[in-house]
Regions:
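Bacterial N-terminal signal peptides that target proteins for export
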Residues: 1-9
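Bacterial N-terminal signal peptides
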Residues: 8-18
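Sec/Tat signal peptide C-region and signal peptidase I cleavage site
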Residues: 19-24
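N-terminal, Lys/Arg-enriched amphipathic/low-complexity engagement segments
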Residues: 25-71
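Short, structured beta-strand/loop micro-motifs enriched in basic residues and often containing a Trp
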Residues: 31-41, 72-79, 263-271
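Glycine-rich anion/phosphate-binding loop at the beta-strand->alpha-helix junction
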Residues: 101-106, 111-114, 118-119, 123-141, ...
Length: 455
């Protein structure tokens, strides 16, 4: 039987007053977001608001593996507290310009894993259960290092929900330009100082994964740092774990046997902030749907690097300082985010036409008496779903609705002038295509797209 979470009238009033206070406060040019949360939605407290054109400086903790091994958290991620944007209403959009991503951690750890079957109820990321006393999301304490160091405060049993099957620890150089895998003797020393090496912020909620002393991979593997943000965007229109705010994870909440369960109809209320797209990095712009009043900008799950697909399931989570410039776009109704990546990150077919290419195309048009569509610029639509096919379908449908054309036409545009790229397995993708600038003008995003690709 599906469980329904009811919010008492007093609690609901307090939550509404909290949001109203944020929205009624004088808008600020700069807002600092340091408080950490594991669940977001309409009941979330918001800070701010920040002005359109203002700056958000967020300091998220290492937030995938850390929350996964922190039983009291109801999510596989954490994010910084939602920031309201002045004037943002449902049906608007908010552009987030990523100005700076500064890695703060000195080391990180990651790997592949399996869930331990008797230590969760339905979802090992959400409803973590102590195998001895049966408490769901039990309070815990740290005793030493390693996989059995995190123990239930009620009964003393080890209670993390995951077993790492192949893990590694990565140590960064001074300027955070690269990392190197290290041997067991070094990971043991890092584990003893895990909070310092991971640079867990003072308001962090998670245990640092570096305390597990993971060293299955050979030492000496060099990994280039190209920091990106795995979970950034707006607050969804239903309360949910921060980790599950994308179609390939929201689906696991439908009819789930725990308190964070949602209905099938609720899936569309996600905002797809948890993209894990490696091109969401310094210099990129993400245009996000507003699904609750104020928008509620959240930042988390910063990675030191990530290959397309994140096929290990996780990557190198780090503490970071993220600087965003915010721009409100009135009346742009989106179902999911639009990404404007850095010019060099665009698919080959979506790059700006050269003068020579335009001239050659116009010669063909002149010869046969038709005009060439030369005034085109690229956009990427995020699609998500339980698997890659459904994610692509989602992205295509979202693009079709945005542009007022058929999905079949989108498929042809994408095939000729863009491409589909994998953000995360099993189901987050980017759908890229060239779009007439006149249409971008009509949508109100032409200045942003021109700023990104014609500067």
């Amino acid at each position: 039987m599906r469980r329904v979470v009811c919010i008492g009238s007093v609690a609901l009033l307090c939550l509404l007053l909290g949001l109203s206070s944020a929205m009624a406060a004088e808008a600020q040019k700069i807002v600092f977001a340091s408080e950490i949360v594991d669940v977001i939605g309409p009941s979330s407290k918001m800070i701010g608001p920040v002005q359109s054109g203002g700056i958000i400086i967020a300091t998220p903790e290492p937030a995938c593996y850390g929350p996964m091994i922190t039983p009291q958290l109801r999510s596989g991620h954490t994010q910084t507290i939602p920031v309201a944007v002045e004037g943002a209403k449902v049906g608007d959009a908010i552009a987030l310009k990523i100005k700076k991503v500064r890695v703060l951690s000195k080391a990180t750890a990651s790997g592949t894993e399996i869930a331990i079957k008797d230590r969760f109820v339905g979802d090992p990321f959400v409803a973590k259960r102590c195998p001895k006393c049966g408490t769901v999301n039990p309070p815990t304490e740290l005793k030493g290092t390693g996989a059995e160091a995190i123990r239930c405060k009620i009964c003393g049993a080890p209670c993390i929900t995951f077993q790492v099957t192949n893990g590694y620890t990565l140590l960064f150089d001074e300027d955070r330009s690269l990392g190197v895998t290290v041997p067991k003797a070094v990971t043991d020393e890092i584990a003893k100082q895990a909070y310092e090496y991971s640079a867990v912020p003072t308001k962090g909620l998670s245990y640092p994964v570096t305390l597990l002393s993971l060293a299955d991979m050979p030492p000496g593997i060099i990994a280039r740092v190209r920091a990106m943000i795995g979970n950034m965007g707006t607050t969804p229109a239903i309360d949910m774990p921060t980790s599950h705010n994308a179609g390939d994870l929201t689906c696991f909440l439908v009819g789930a046997p725990h308190k964070m369960a949602i209905t099938k109809a609720d899936e569309a209320k996600r905002s797809d902030a948890h993209m894990d797209i490696d091109n969401v990095r310094e210099g990129a712009i993400v245009i996000c749907p507003v699904k609750v009043a104020g928008g509620g900008i959240v930042v988390g799950d910063v990675h030191a690097m990530q290959g397309d697909g994140e096929i290990s399931g996780h990557t190198t989570d780090v503490s970071a300082e993220v600087t965003l410039e915010v721009e409100l776009i009135k009346g742009l109704k989106l179902e999911g985010p639009i990404l404007l990546p850095n010019k060099e990150d665009l698919p080959f077919l979506a790059k700006e036409y050269t003068a020579d290419q335009l001239q050659r195309a116009r010669s063909i048009g002149d010869k046969f008496g038709f005009a060439v569509l030369g005034d085109l610029l690229p956009i990427q639509m995020i699609g998500s779903g339980p698997n890659l096919n459904e994610a692509v379908g989602c992205g295509v449908d979202r693009m079709a609705k945005l542009l007022g054309i058929t999905p079949e036409a989108v498929k042809n545009w994408v095939t000729m002038t863009g491409g589909v790229e994998i953000g995360r397995l099993p189901g987050v993708v980017t759908v890229t295509m060239m779009v007439p600038v006149a249409k971008l003008q009509e949508l109100g995003i032409a200045p942003l797209v021109k700023e990104q690709y014609l500067k």
